[in-house]
């Protein structure tokens, strides 16, 4: 592939890690953010210490606060901003962009009030004459591992296979490999909903439960994620792939996962306000829990784990009571769909 110019919107941990992957592949990378001190740090010291204390970035990675300068003559734009501001940033891009580009996003969540997937938001806010079909970049990936060039395999999903293949080639190298998929709904919902289950898995750890319980919440969590995804139009097969069970395992079992750490802290009795203040990073699983719960209620999808976590987070239900409520649910067959 010829050298491409890529704007990465969002200098968080994942945006920074993906910027390094693109730079390693010989592309021009422009990171955009709205915190001048952070942007200056990236440009002056080639570090982003809020997320990576010991990592030095390549000096060719340049950061900007000016969106127009960032987007000038770019070939592709990668959104890696928090879910709650995706629509706002997309509107700003639509007002600034003056040519057609490839649009990708690597964020995982649902818009809090509308419950919409992020690709839907991007389609609504960026006119067709300025963009390709949206490509979702998702899968089992800790930024802390990708930034040190540990092996990572994820998915590029788009309704248009050729566009997904472009992104596959854009990112893939000896340590970072992408597979293509045309099931955008499946890949996107899997990436968003696994954060809820990760909060639950972390809570079990914080409460002192063992591996049996953690394995159960991942397996049963995958079942309810799949039910909701299929109700929205996804293929059930997607949930057995990298963006489904793969992402659920890595997020639901690792201390690297901010959603797992948030659940662990909840299990140990910390308040949600303290957890969010101490972590200093967006915990997508918190807002996604409400969106998924309300969506499941609307569609009539059975999601007992999501419901339990929703009750704990938004109604103050005791975590142990929520767990034992699930254990006392009506008996069901394992493969029962509702």
Curated annotation (Swiss-Prot):
Catalytic activity: sn-glycerol 3-phosphate + NAD(+) = dihydroxyacetone phosphate + NADH + H(+); sn-glycerol 3-phosphate + NADP(+) = dihydroxyacetone phosphate + NADPH + H(+)
Binding-site residues for NADPH, renumbered to this chain: 13-14, 108, 143, 258, 282, 284
Gene coding for it: gpsA
Known role: Catalyzes the reduction of the glycolytic intermediate dihydroxyacetone phosphate (DHAP) to sn-glycerol 3-phosphate (G3P), the key precursor for phospholipid synthesis.
Keywords for this protein: Cytoplasm, Lipid biosynthesis, Lipid metabolism, NAD, NADP, Nucleotide-binding, Oxidoreductase, Phospholipid biosynthesis, Phospholipid metabolism
Residue positions of the active site: 194 (proton acceptor)
GO molecular function: glycerol-3-phosphate dehydrogenase [NAD(P)+] activity; NAD binding
EC number of the protein: 1.1.1.94
InterPro entries: 6-PGluconate_DH-like_C_sf (IPR008927), 6PGD_dom2 (IPR013328), G3P_DH_NAD-dep (IPR006168), G3P_DH_NAD-dep_C (IPR006109), G3P_DH_NAD-dep_N (IPR011128), NAD(P)-bd_dom_sf (IPR036291)
Disulfide bridge map: none
Domain of life of the source: Bacteria
Known pathway: Membrane lipid metabolism; glycerophospholipid metabolism
Intracellular or extracellular location(s): Cytoplasm
Main location: cytoplasm
PROSITE patterns membership: NAD_G3PDH
Positions contributing to sn-glycerol 3-phosphate binding: 108, 139, 141, 194, 247, 257-259
GO BP of this protein: carbohydrate metabolic process; glycerol-3-phosphate biosynthetic process; glycerol-3-phosphate catabolic process; glycerol-3-phosphate metabolic process; glycerophospholipid metabolic process; phospholipid biosynthetic process
GO cellular component labels: cytosol
Enzyme class: oxidoreductase
Record's protein name: Glycerol-3-phosphate dehydrogenase [NAD(P)+]
UniProt family annotation: Belongs to the NAD-dependent glycerol-3-phosphate dehydrogenase family.
